[in-house]
Every structure is written in structure tokens, then in C-alpha cells.
Regions:
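Short mixed-charge
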Residues: 2-4, 198-215, 271, 275-277, ...
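Cap/lid segment of the alpha/beta-hydrolase catalytic domain
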Residues: 79-101, 113-211
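N-terminal cap/lid segment of alpha/beta-hydrolase-fold proteins
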Residues: 47-116
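Acidic, Ser/Thr/Gly/Pro-rich low-complexity segments and short DxT(G/T)-type signature motifs
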Residues: 1-51, 56, 84-92, 125, ...
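Structural recognition of the beta-strand scaffold that forms the well-ordered cores
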Residues: 17-19, 66, 119-122, 148-153, ...
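Hydrolase active-site cap/lid region
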Residues: 161-168, 234-290
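Solvent-exposed loop/turn segments at secondary-structure junctions
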Residues: 25, 72-74, 125-129, 155-159, ...
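Gly/Ala-rich beta-loop-alpha elbow adjacent to hydrolase catalytic centers
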Residues: 220-233
């Protein structure tokens, strides 16, 4: 192989082969999830359940609505951290029995506006959760611009995934469990976006009404993601059929380059990855490969 490539062994330090990315390898599985899930919906609103409605939970929030929604399941182990795709003969994920239950939160802003609020999906940061949506800056944005923010978790890279992420850092051969669940998580964002714009979704629910009138404008939904939410938000926006505009704030770069340079990663680097892979070159190649 080296000879065919015109590489002289005398000047060679090391060599290895690897597979480069293709359109199919980058997008094929995620598009299979999206197309299969929305074909299953067949134009209907996704199923959801409201579990909590809290009036004025924080400054700037008129009402907080929390609940769960159903996402077609493509992972083993019920979709829990560590679950993986079941691949068909074509190499694409196959549907698994049951559904994945995803959490959501929506905050209605306390404003004087009588116009229905625009809708936005929020994407949280590194290994966080949907609660980041309710921070002071987002609340101010919602008040100033009459926006109802809704969020779910980036399953695969959410707070509940930290134990599995630590296991993977100790053995990078298990990285597929993160990548697979993360695509299930992106599917969750797609389904929540559909729930936000569908005429039989949130806009038809009394929890999203005041004095019998809907307080949201479901004609369009936007996306707002920060840090990890900006990195993963790019993939989400690329495959979303309902969201055409979004903000990707402080996105940084792909994880293979970012993590080794991030102070937020120091705890995992020093506590798990370095002991498992003492040589820096091994760590860099491993992170680049995944």
C-alpha cells in the first residue's frame, strides 16, 4: 500500500490508514431517523403530556409549563444512556419497539404585549439540561422581544449522560453509544419543533392560553443555541424541516479540536482520559477519530 501511494519507507516515521467522511456517513443515519419518525407521525401532532404548570416561577416569567413528549425510539436499552442503534442491512438505524419519553419546558414571558408571542427552541450547553433555558439573559430576551422559549435536553450530551461519557473517555471504542444517543436527541428537538408549530400541538392547549386566547404564534419557530447548543444546533438546523432561522452563539469548533483546549473539559481530561491514554498523541488521534 505504501509503495502504491509513492511513500518511501526510508523517510517514514509512521503511517496508518483511515476512512474519510462522506455525505452518507455524515447524514445518512440522522436523515433515516428524521424521515422514519415523521412518516410515522403522518401529519399528526406528536403525543405529549403536561405535568406541571407554575404561575410566575421567576422574574420575567408569567407561566412555566413542563411535561413530556413521545419520540420514536431507535436505541437499545429503552433509549437510556449507553443505548445504541440497531442497524439494518443497509447500515441505517431500525425502529425499536416503544417510544422515547423526552422532557420539555416552556416559559411564557411576563410582557405587556397583546400580540401572540413568537416561538423559539433553546439548546443548552456542555453536558447541561433544559433548565439553562430559564437563565436571566434568556428571560430578558423573552421579555424584550415577546418570545416563548421551549427546550428539551440534548440527550447523548446532557447532564444525565455524564456517567456514560466518563466510561467512554476511559475506553473510546464505546463512543458510538454517545453518537447514537445524540442523534436520538436531535430527533427529539425535531419532534418538539413540530409540536410547537402544529395546529393541534401547544397552540391548541389551554396551558398556552390566557383568557381563552392562545398566547403563541405557531406560524414559525426559531432556534437559539449557546456553546454546545450552538455546535449541535448546526446539525439540528441542517435537518430540521420546521426551523429555518436560528442563532448559534459561541459555537467554537468540532469536539475533536475543542475539548483538548477547553477549561470546561479539564476535569474529565485529568480525571479520566489522561489515565486511560497517557500519551497525548493517542488522545489527540482518538478524539479526532471520534
Amino acid at each position: 500500500d505504501l509503495g502504491r501511494a509513492g511513500v518511501e519507507r526510508a523517510a517514514l516515521h509512521s503511517a496508518w490508514d483511515f476512512t474519510v467522511a462522506s455525505t452518507e456517513s455524515l447524514t445518512g443515519r440522522m436523515l433515516a431517523l428524521r424521515d422514519g419518525a415523521f412518516a410515522e407521525l403522518d401529519g399528526k401532532a406528536p403525543a405529549y403530556r403536561i405535568t406541571t404548570v407554575i404561575e410566575a416561577p421567576d422574574d420575567g416569567i408569567r407561566r412555566r409549563i413542563e411535561g413530556t413528549f413521545d419520540v420514536p425510539l431507535y436505541l437499545t436499552d429503552g433509549g437510556r444512556p449507553g443505548g445504541r442503534f440497531v442497524l439494518g442491512d443497509d447500515g441505517r438505524p431500525t425502529r425499536v419497539d416503544g417510544t422515547f419519553t423526552a422532557a420539555f419546558r416552556c416559559d411564557l414571558p411576563a410582557t405587556d404585549s397583546t400580540a401572540p408571542a413568537r416561538l423559539a427552541l433553546y439548546g443548552h450547553g456542555l453536558l447541561g439540561d433544559l433548565g439553562e433555558m430559564s437563565g436571566s439573559l434568556t428571560r430578558r430576551m423573552a421579555q424584550d422581544h415577546n418570545i416563548v422559549y421551549c427546550a428539551t435536553n440534548w440527550y447523548g450530551m446532557a447532564e444525565e449522560d455524564i456517567p456514560n461519557a466518563a466510561r467512554v473517555l476511559a475506553d473510546l471504542s464505546g463512543f458510538d453509544s454517545i453518537a447514537d444517543r445524540l442523534q436520538q436527541g436531535i430527533l427529539g428537538f425535531l419532534v418538539l419543533g413540530r409540536l410547537m408549530v402544529h395546529d393541534q400541538g401547544f397552540v391548541a392547549d389551554p396551558a398556552f392560553a390566557v383568557d381563552g386566547r392562545p398566547v403563541i404564534d405557531n406560524s414559525r419557530v426559531y432556534y437559539d443555541g449557546n456553546s454546545q447548543g450552538a455546535i449541535l444546533g448546526g446539525a439540528f438546523l441542517a435537518v430540521s424541516q420546521d426551523v429555518t432561522r436560528g442563532v448559534l452563539a459561541e459555537a467554537g469548533m468540532n469536539y475533536g479540536l475543542l475539548l483538548d483546549r477547553s477549561v470546561d473539559f479539564d476535569e474529565y481530561l485529568n480525571g479520566v482520559l489522561k489515565p486511560a491514554y497517557p500519551a497525548r498523541i493517542d488522545r489527540l488521534i482518538g478524539m479526532a477519530a471520534v
